[in-house]
Amino acid sequence: MDLLLLEKTLIGLFLAAVVAIAVSTLRGRKFKLPPGPLPVPIFGNWLQVGDDLNHRNLTDLAKKFGDIFLLRMGQRNLVVVSSPELAKEVLHTQGVEFGSRTRNVVFDIFTGKGQDMVFTVYGEHWRKMRRIMTVPFFTNKVVQQYRHGWESEAAAVVEDVKKNPDAAVSGTVIRRRLQLMMYNNMYRIMFDRRFESEEDPIFQRLRALNGERSRLAQSFEYNYGDFIPILRPFLKGYLKICKEVKETRLKLFKDYFVDERKKLGSTKSTNNNNELKCAIDHILDAQRKGEINEDNVLYIVENINVAAIETTLWSIEWGIAELVNHPEIQQKLRDEIDRVLGAGHQVTEPDIQKLPYLQAVVKETLRLRMAIPLLVPHMNLHDAKLGGYDIPAESKILVNAWWLANNPAHWKKPEEFRPERFFEEESLVEANGNDFRYLPFGVGRRSCPGIILALPILGITLGRLVQNFELLPPPGQSQIDTSEKGGQFSLHILKHSTIVAKPRSF
């Protein structure tokens, strides 16, 4: 770092310290703030808790400070909520007050400062984007239109694994093939397109760019520059990479998918009012009507690439891992499928309603291994009240949904993978947020609308894999490693596991 930058930074630190002390004193008199560790000027609690604000570390802090606590991260207030009652306040009762989204330097780049739907602030733009995205993506009509495609993609996975000579002996990293399946599931909906194989050059570019985007956005390593603006110059190189990745991704979306669809113009299906057009046709209609611009179109595609593909893939991978490590549960699920559907009848989307144990396996996977354990952060635009405390305007609000679903005060032996709980003591709990102890998709205005797609895709995929294979750990291992890797608000398996898949004979 050159001396001029160092000098400016030191001067900035001194001035910020003076301002921070003054502001902290004034605000302390004005507000009754939630409890939390004592902050220091400039850095707040950052030096105490560090960058790694994952769900388990925040759970440890909740055990110390209570169901609501405040972390002062540099110049930002971070409020963490860890009880069903307070989660209900944030997500439902005061859903408008806490319905906005926080900004950070990296997500500002990847979303064009909130031109998307998922990360934009609460208001008219969000309502418009939600409406435009709901019809082509998140309705029962979409499920019925595309469920045959999901079933055929799952069937293709089964056939490819059967053809792999290593899969039944030394094992295969099945995630790679499932990733292609998930891209095809969503690109069918978005563009009426699919990729024939993992070797498809466009698929490889998409996968690489989306992976890099996920790594950059989910990393904790940029937090210091986001929390403490005067340290932001040190992020210059990191943010430059983010901008390059964003621009390359959006150009790929535009050149190979959006513009290609525009060239096709009206097709036979789009002229038939009784048939649902693919999603991009609906979105381009909104652009032609002047409701959104081209950037909004591309950021909708960006949201689906991130929020729909990867999160569902993480959950499928977790489900497979738990079934491998619990062979008795895997066999119980297989027995249910054989008994209800009969030998050779492959699981379809309508069949899921006849398979309660399969539904319970999906729900238990989402409980124990929640893909978005802290949900997407919320924010209050104005000063608010929560749990008897004052919450200053523009505070970042995290709901520790993983702890809500894994707190032994609310769940019987929550550390166990036990689908039976959803037949026994938790028989009334559903994934749609009907119980604030269990919020895998959130609830309320900013809940994840992708629940309507994720649940059937999870059911079809896990059902067909268990139906067609005995899933085992690789030779020499009694179990597969289920160590976690947490991100800004993600939870996925640390190591993509090798799975032995022995075909069954019917």
UniProtKB/Swiss-Prot annotation:
Keywords: Heme, Iron, Membrane, Metal-binding, Monooxygenase, Oxidoreductase, Transmembrane, Transmembrane helix
Pathway(s) annotated for this protein in UniProt: Phenylpropanoid metabolism; trans-4-coumarate biosynthesis; trans-4-coumarate from trans-cinnamate: step 1/1
Induction, per UniProt: By fungal elicitor.
Membrane topology recorded in Swiss-Prot or TrEMBL: Single-pass membrane protein
EC number(s) from the headed UniProt entry: 1.14.14.91
Residues bound to (E)-cinnamate: R213, S214, R215, L216, A217, Q218, A307
PANTHER family: TRANS-CINNAMATE 4-MONOOXYGENASE
Identification of the protein by name: Trans-cinnamate 4-monooxygenase
Protein species of origin: Glycine max (Soybean)
